[in-house]
């Protein structure tokens, strides 16, 4: 599984992406060019900063938010976004809290967000920009057309990266069946998989920002990546040094910065195989990835096979009786494994010829 990054901003974007009631209200205020200041949450920490205004305690609707924003003061909405607590309120945060904003509305929003750790939204009257603050986080909401353009560009980049990854994996598949895999081939495949997954993360952020307008992008993304992450994890499991936990290795790879990821030696070190020549070191897979492609073979049976034979080449060379002796494998399953691996080998050879 991927390490969750930017959980705070993701949770905020979910409640204010296109298609939500809150976003509709913000867009109405933006189009009216009245400007606005909204605080999400009516806890004690927020309410003690509120001065004046009038209490409404009415159901939240986008049209109510738009009408109330015509007044200069702030609008306070409950944390569940169901009620407008008060409107035309003056917010008086601690003036000693540092802020780099210039406009009065944005300075107030920034300070309130820092002091209460609540979501505060400032809508600029002149610049037509919606800015969200939460704690130290500042995020400017962009128009859907801008995000769509960036998402489509990222998808085109992803297509090219996936095509390169497929070529690398096809080459690796052939070498695995010939038992001629080098550390260079393995590390290149893992590096390329991680590059693809990082672009996927970026596109997922765009999808989150687009809300209900991101469905087509999401469908295209799912079609492109399919089982890439799963195969990448199995690749790590096949080649990481004995004694290392494959999920921890995967986490270390995710933590590599962009320049480290470009260094194949750095990727090799995460597998516990640093300091050895990449091109000249032959390395045999355990077989998790290839065996996972054989239909109807449970994971515990794959574990038993690898525990017994240790390497994929030994499993390929084993006859049906040898496979039958492994716990959880009868004659029928042994035949299925043998035939399945043979079929995969033929498919791999055909792809190479093409």
From Swiss-Prot:
Its cofactor is Mg(2+). This is DNA integrity scanning protein DisA. Its EC number is 2.7.7.85. It is an enzyme of class 2 (transferase). Keywords: ATP-binding, DNA damage, DNA repair, DNA-binding, Magnesium, Nucleotide-binding, Nucleotidyltransferase, Transferase. InterPro entries: DisA (IPR050338), DisA_sf (IPR038331), DNA_integrity_DisA_N_sf (IPR036888), DNA_integrity_scan_DisA_link (IPR018906), DNA_integrity_scan_DisA_N (IPR003390), DNA_integrity_scanning_protein (IPR023763), RuvA_2-like (IPR010994). Belongs to the DisA family. Residues 6-144 form the DAC domain. The keyword Signal does not apply. Participates in a DNA-damage check-point that is active prior to asymmetric division when DNA is damaged. DisA forms globular foci that rapidly scan along the chromosomes during sporulation, searching for lesions. When a lesion is present, DisA pauses at the lesion site. This triggers a cellular response that culminates in a temporary block in sporulation initiation.
């Amino acid at each position: 599984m991927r390490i969750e990054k930017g959980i705070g901003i993701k949770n905020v974007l979910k409640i204010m992406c296109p298609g939500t009631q809150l976003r509709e209200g913000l867009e109405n205020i933006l189009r009216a060019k009245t400007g606005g200041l909204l605080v999400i949450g009516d806890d004690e920490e927020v309410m003690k900063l509120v001065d004046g205004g009038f209490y409404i305690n009415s159901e939240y609707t986008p049209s109510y938010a738009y009408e109330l924003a015509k007044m200069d003061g702030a609008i306070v909405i409950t944390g569940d976004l169901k009620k407008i607590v008060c409107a035309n309120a003056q917010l008086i945060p601690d003036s000693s809290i540092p802020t780099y904003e210039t406009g009065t509305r944005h300075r107030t929003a920034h300070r309130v967000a820092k002091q209460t750790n609540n979501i505060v939204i400032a809508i600029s009257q002149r610049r037509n920009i919606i800015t969200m603050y939460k704690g130290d986080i500042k995020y400017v909401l962009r128009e859907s057309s801008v995000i769509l353009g960036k998402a489509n560009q990222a998808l085109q980049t992803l297509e090219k990266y996936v095509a390169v990854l497929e070529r690398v994996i096809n080459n690796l598949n052939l070498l695995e069946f010939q038992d001629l895999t080098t550390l260079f081939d393995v590390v290149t495949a893992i590096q390329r998989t991680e590059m693809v997954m990082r672009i996927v993360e970026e596109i997922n952020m765009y999808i989150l920002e687009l809300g209900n307008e991101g469905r087509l992008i999401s469908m295209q993304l799912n079609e492109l990546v399919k089982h890439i992450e799963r195969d990448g994890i199995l690749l790590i499991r096949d080649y990481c040094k004995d004694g290392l936990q494959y999920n921890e290795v995967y986490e270390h790879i995710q933590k590599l910065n962009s320049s480290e990821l470009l260094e194949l030696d750095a990727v090799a070190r995460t597998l516990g195989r640093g300091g050895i020549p990449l091109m000249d070191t032959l390395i045999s897979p355990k077989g998790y990835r290839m065996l996972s492609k054989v239909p109807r073979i449970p994971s515990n049976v794959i574990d038993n096979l690898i525990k017994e034979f240790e390497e994929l080449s030994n499993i390929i060379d084993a006859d049906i009786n040898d496979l039958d002796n492994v716990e959880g494998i009868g004659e029928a399953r042994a035949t299925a494994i043998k035939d399945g691996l043979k079929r995969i080998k033929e498919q791999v050879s055909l792809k190479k010829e093409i």
